[in-house]
């Protein structure tokens, strides 16, 4: 099983080749500047790379006995639309019985209407990137509101300063990445990663 988990170098190679990892000058929605940006859906648009990443993440869950013993009677949950492809890929790799995803509606993260009419299996929360951990924490909250246990958490990539512990559950990832953010353009231009790249405003 371990051989099916791609090393971080292989994961980064996939992200670079598919355009999911980009270098340049990016302004994030919070106004901060960075030299790097991930657009993970570009890696999941291709079957082969999506399969490698999904199987790799799924193996991290299978290697944990407390999770493995509950498969396939588990639900794979994405905190948002961005992680839906990850959720379906991991669901297929684990042969999990259920897949769900949350959405932001009226400023609040929640499931679609009537989801609580059906019994949800123990949950594994997956996403494309763990940036601040906020979406994962909010998803844990709404899952627990349904009386469902969260047994696993994982993402394809995580920022180095992102939280890895959520209520005692270790968040797994295939790649950890050091992204330096700068409050102003002047600060960014003074960094080692600055370039002459044209400014791009990114959106999530």
Give the predicted meaning of each segment:
Residues 2-14, 140-204:
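PRPP-dependent phosphoribosyltransferase catalytic core
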Residues 67-68, 113-118, 185:
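Short amphipathic alpha-helix with an adjacent loop that forms part of the alpha/beta core around
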């Amino acid at each position: 099983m371990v051989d099916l988990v791609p090393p971080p170098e292989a994961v980064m190679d996939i992200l670079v080749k598919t355009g999911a990892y980009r270098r340049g000058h990016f302004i994030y929605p919070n106004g901060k500047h960075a030299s790097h940006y991930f657009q993970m859906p570009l890696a999941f648009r291709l079957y082969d790379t999506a399969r490698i990443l999904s199987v790799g993440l799924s193996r991290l869950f299978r290697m944990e006995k407390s999770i493995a013993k509950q498969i396939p009677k588990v639900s794979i949950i994405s905190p948002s639309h961005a992680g839906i492809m990850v959720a379906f890929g991991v669901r297929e790799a684990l042969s999990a019985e259920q897949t769900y995803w949350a959405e932001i509606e009226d400023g609040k993260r929640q499931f679609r209407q009537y989801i609580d009419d059906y019994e949800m299996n123990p949950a594994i929360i997956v996403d494309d990137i763990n940036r601040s951990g906020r979406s994962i924490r909010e998803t844990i909250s709404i899952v627990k509101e349904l009386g469902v246990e969260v047994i696993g958490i994982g993402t394809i990539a995580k920022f180095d300063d992102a939280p890895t512990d959520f209520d005692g559950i270790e968040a797994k990832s295939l790649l950890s990445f050091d992204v330096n953010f700068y409050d102003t353009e002047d600060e960014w231009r003074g960094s080692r990663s600055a370039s002459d790249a044209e400014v791009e405003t990114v959106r999530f």
